[in-house]
């Protein structure tokens, strides 16, 4: 065990984490030059295209160090985005050390800080690396100061590297061997292993990536999952090199995979503990919690014929994504679809993109909402994620909304613009810390103001120089209302929104004007109204198309023309009472872009 090193990589999106991982694999001979491709560990197409890591991955490499010994390096590649922070915390708890990679030109970003603090809280040894030192814009001195100021980690022994050119890779590996401690654990104690990640394989069932804490798991060992009590017999254990390689057993301190004929992903939840069914450990590992979605949206197929295909596609995605939760939903306007819960906005985009790309579906997505707490007049608290589940306005006593604490890192030049954005989104400033070049802003913000367009606006007001990390703080009472949209006196359930009363008139007017532009003209007048309960706060009309019925009347008595116009008006009135307005897809997309 003294020659095992377990470590994770902490880095912001696009700071070169997956490229450094590729260099490690090449340097240690995990794959031949012919088998190498860029971003080896990012298995999904969408991961490679967006340049992000979504699922945790692991590789076991043998490194021949300068001191003549051979070390087993177990390296766990983790996601870098705030939506996947639970996966990051579980991956970190499986390690004794972490590699902090910072782009030498961009400097420290908020997500890196959050993950680094998680690592330090868990007692991990942090090894700092400055990547991309070959870039003309690289400023190693400034970034080293930032690492010390913002994160509080010693930066005098930072390794300078360029993964693209292969500079400094051996120095990083030597630092890992020297500075990261050996794993603790007892091979003779009852089995205890942490599930770092699980995914579904259509031939093997659920494959779990595990870190052995105590004991030894062999083929035919009978194991038990702590949280749900499920018992299984192990069919196969092994390691990734990064190819799947079978071995005889996994011992305390090692990281590898386990296959035990588990049929669905809920059978092996991320962060759970595995023990022996015959001789179980007395208690589970700390920190396990079921994954809770915090953003909800309705997704509907454009063609009703695609509903079955959509349902099957969701079931397949769910096999690999335990955080994805869904239930059927029916909308008068959009037909049958599903209400889906996501970890955050990036997670929502990725799920939508995978459904459209991998399963060839055309989908409409409604405005995302969060979970509200509603206290009714009888004192009962309802947790509501959809307007269709709302109690009536008369029975609502109090509205509570989720509040988050956001940490925003921005260069000093754009502080004013970012503060104005936070104020516009009903943010309350809690702290502001000036550092050498960056400023750290701590704000409390309502989550429903963040889910629509906050990230896009933050990037645009800061010219891309701001980054943000957030965590849930509490529920807080707020003056929220339900804004309904009616077309020809018919409420359109899919367009209803929950918002703060102060914003309702402005947003109602914007919504109605936008819809007036987008709804095509009909043979009758179309009335668009925004209302709160029975109070109309905004109204507009889409004028009817009309045929010139008097064109064939030349001269003669005016009563003939009046008779024809009256007949036309009666026809329009009858048409309006029976006619339906088809709302184009663009209207729903426009709602998402209303500020």
Curated annotation (Swiss-Prot):
Enzyme Commission number, as recorded: 3.6.5.n1
Q: Entry's Pfam families?
A: EFG_C, GTP_EFTU, LepA_C
What role is this protein assigned?
Answer: Required for accurate and efficient protein synthesis under certain stress conditions. May act as a fidelity factor of the translation reaction, by catalyzing a one-codon backward translocation of tRNAs on improperly translocated ribosomes. Back-translocation proceeds from a post-translocation (POST) complex to a pre-translocation (PRE) complex, thus giving elongation factor G a second chance to translocate the tRNAs correctly. Binds to ribosomes in a GTP-dependent manner.
The organism's superkingdom is given as: Bacteria
Q: Which organism is the protein's source? A: Vesicomyosocius okutanii subsp. Calyptogena okutanii (strain HA)
Principal localization? membrane
Q: Which GO terms describe its biological process?
A: positive regulation of translation
Q: Where in the sequence is the signal peptide annotated?
A: none
Output a single Gene Ontology CC term carried by this record: plasma membrane
Key words, A-Z: Cell inner membrane, Cell membrane, GTP-binding, Hydrolase, Membrane, Nucleotide-binding, Protein biosynthesis
**Subcellular location(s) of the protein:** Cell inner membrane
**What name does the UniProt record give this protein?**
Elongation factor 4
Q: Which gene encodes it?
A: lepA
The record ties this protein, via NCBIfam families, to:
lepA, small_GTP
